[in-house]
Amino acid sequence: MLISTAAVLAVVLLLQLVVSPLLNRRVYTDDLVDGSGYPTFDVGMSALAGLYMPLGDYYGSYAEHSGFMRDTLHLTFYDRTGSNRFNIQTQTGLSLGHVGQLNSGDLHAIGYMYSGFFYDNRNPGRNDVWSGDTGQAALDALPEYMRLTSAVSFHKVLTVDELADIMARHPDVDFLSANVWVDGAYNYDSLHCSLQHMMLAYGDDLEEDYPGMQLQEYKNLTGEDITQHFRAMVQYLADHPEVAKAGPDEPYRYKEMLLNLEEDGLEVLGLWVQGTPDQITALLDEELVRSVGNYDARIQLWT
């Protein structure tokens, strides 16, 4: 009996002190591993933010041992709308090399798992401002010291080249993210492609392995630049299913997205932007723009 008890305790200690840490370190580590030059988990979180969090970005993490064979990952996300002054904090678990899913409630403020804003290009968001005299007057009534976060809806599904043309004609507008679609994704309503550079700089090694992923030059983008940025983020998650499991799509779907991206290209369903009332109003002059929905308005403290 004593031998059996000792054997059980030995197995438990082996799991707790050796096996679990080794498996968890395959998913999360603060150190650079395999000479890759970038932290695998953090890059994966940045990719998930770029694909599913149109109003925010990933800002960092740390791990804390929290129980038997379990670590808690403390994650920070940046809120581009300014609603959360001290950024957004959330947690997920890591046990025996399996990471838990992200908390959609904590991340809702930055657009994680949003639905309905661009459904069938009919619903651009709340507080709709339609193109035309009424919408123009509503935007004109806002003072120029306001900074708007707005959802832009189109008359039709756009190509990435058409999106790039609109961006080129409005250099003063901050284009945050495009609501996009490629076959293979589970829910087209929540899939996006960020149009801003990643908050964390991962260096040349990541750029060499996944060209365009960091979107270091995010001004004057071409349609191919946007497609390559999307391709790189999806490819990274396809290559790292252990991190991709934290997101809303099953890891195998990223491989399907890549195949369909090459065959059919990337479709643009809507757009998230920031700017002054005049800058947002100018978008209504675009022939392809159907409407603008003001999601958030804040006083701009800089010029």
What is the predicted role of each segment?
Residues 159, 279-280:
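Short beta-strands and strand-coil junctions in structured, solvent-facing domains, enriched
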Residues 280-291:
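Short, exposed beta-strand-loop hairpins at the edges of beta-sheets
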Residues 2-18:
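Hydrophobic membrane-insertion alpha-helices, especially the h-region
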Residues 16, 20-272, 290-303:
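Loop-rich non-cytosolic ectodomains and luminal regions
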Residues 266, 277-278:
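Active-site-adjacent structural elements in enzyme catalytic domains
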